[in-house]
Amino acid sequence: MSQIRAFLAIDLDDDLKPKIHKIIKEFKQIDADIKYVDLQNLHFTLKFFGDIDTDGIDLISSKIENVIKDFDSFNIKIKGCGAFPNTNRIKVIWVGLDEDEILKNLHDRLDKEFNSIGFDLDKKYSSHLTIGRMKSAKGKADVKKTMETNKTVDIGTMEVNTIILKKSTLTPSGPIYEDLIEYRL
């Protein structure tokens, strides 16, 4: 029995990536210790499973299908820039979403289904697109200023019509993602 590191995600539309790239370029002008996410890896995580047995993929897949049958495609508005856990202790730099009830409902329904097969419930779901991770406090003041400048930046709207079960392989140069199964809404 083998294991993979897996998560369920929504990929960012390609036509919105140039706007995200523009924001990343602003951060790159700062002398800060930030590891940036590759544009092709940008996604919204719906559920991080961690290491799972490959035998369990069919069960996870059936739970996903059980939930998404009740959902049609929907639009999300991508906007704003911030940090986790907060702007005083920056670990993750993100681009956010206008709070979306359909996306929250989709997440909550999936979370309950996964909990029924032994996965922990998410503590608090905050949909975001990680664009970078701060490795040290170097340049923090300028990072905060750039975040403030982009606090309400409007990236655009995209249709969510697919969610994807992905495999993540960690490497020294960063994670490599592989799409395992696509689910159409």
Positions of the model-derived regions?
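Histidine-dependent nucleotide/RNA phosphoesterase domain, centered on the 2H-phosphoesterase fold
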Residues: 1-185
